[in-house]
Amino acid sequence: MKWMQARISVAFLILFIMTFSACGTFAPTAPPLIASRTPTILPVIVSPQRTETFTPLPPTATIFPTSTLAPLNLNPQIIVLAENFSEPDDLVLAADGSVYISDVTEGTIQQYTPAGQLNLILSGLSSPEGMAFLPDGSLIIAEQGTNRLLHYDLNSKTLTPFFDLVNNTNNLGVDGILWDGANLIVPDSPNGTVLEISAQGQTVRQLASGLARPTGAWLESTGNLLIADENGNAVFRLYRDGALEKVGDFSIPDDVVADAAGNIFVITLGDDAIHVLIAGTNQDVILVSGLNDPQGIIFDTEGNLIMTDSGNHRLLKVLIH
C-alpha cells in the first residue's frame, strides 16, 4: 500500500509542475489600501453552543493589572488640567501617555502632553467626536458632522477619508469609537447599531442592533464590550455572540470605561455626574457630581480618570487611586 501511495504522490507532483509551468509565473496581488465604498457586510453568527472565549489584544495603555493599583477612592480629588476650551468632547490616550481631545465647536484635535502642554494637532473638522489609535500609531477620527471616519497620519500629517457611514435619519451622526486590539468598534449612533470595522476599512460587521443611540464603547478585560446607549438611558454588555445584557440604568449616559478589577465608570449628561458600578456588587455610586455637560472619559497611564467637563470648557483629572 505504501509503494502505491508513493507512486501516486510522484505522479501528482509531476502533473502540478507541468500545469504551473504552462500558466507562467504566479504574482500575488496586494490588497487595496483604500477603504471600499461598498464594504463587505458580514452577518452576525449566533451559536448557543459556543464555548470558546474571545480574547483580543487589549488597547494600548487602557487596561491595568489590579495588582498595580491602589484601592478605589470613592471620595476623589479633582485636578483641573487645562481650561478655556470651546466644547471639549471625546478623549483617547496615546502610547506616550499624552491625551488627545476633540473639540466639536472648534473642529479641532488637541494634544495634552504629560508635561502639561497643549498642542494643536488638527483643525477645520466638522464636529469631531471619538478617536482611536491604530497599531501603526495613526489616528482614526469620528467626524459627526459628515458621519464618517477619517484617518490621520501623525508622521506625514496627512488627513484622508477612511470610512463613510450611512445616516438616512434626522439623527446626529457618529459619536464615540474604540480600537479593541483587532478592529474598530463603532457605535453607529444614528442607526442604533454597533459595527465592527477592519483596520483597513474594507469589511464591516454588525454586532448589535435595536439600541436607541449608542455613543460610547469600551473593551472589558473579559473581552466583552460595554456600550453606552445615550437615548436608551442604559449601559449594556455586548457579548461576542451578539447577546446584549443591561448593566444598569443611567440618565443619558454618554461614555463608559471599566478597569481590570471590573469597576465600571459611566459619564452621564442627565445628572452631570460620573457614576461607578462597584465590581462584585453592582452598587451604583456617584463618584463626581456638579459637572456641566460631561462628555469624554478615559484612564491615564496611572489608572486615574481623565474627563472633559464640556460645559465648563475644561479638562479634569479624577484621582481614584
Name each model-derived stretch.
Residues 61-101, 106, 315-321:
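An edge-strand/N-cap motif at the start of beta-rich repeat modules
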Residues 84, 99-105, 141-147, 186-190, ...:
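Conserved beta-strand positions in repeat-built beta-propeller and related beta-rich domains
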Residues 112-117, 153-157, 197-202, 238-243, ...:
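Short loop/turn segments that connect beta-strands within beta-propeller blades
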Residues 107-109, 147-150, 192-194, 233-235, ...:
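Structural signal for beta-propeller blades
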Residues 77-83, 117-122, 158-168, 202-208, ...:
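A short beta-strand motif characteristic of beta-propeller blades
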Residues 293-321:
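Blade-level signature of beta-propeller repeat domains, shared across WD40, Kelch, NHL, RCC1
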Residues 83-96, 124-138, 167-183, 210-224, ...:
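Beta-rich, blade/repeat-based domains predominating
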Residues 23-77:
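Ser/Thr-rich, Proline-interspersed low-complexity disordered segments
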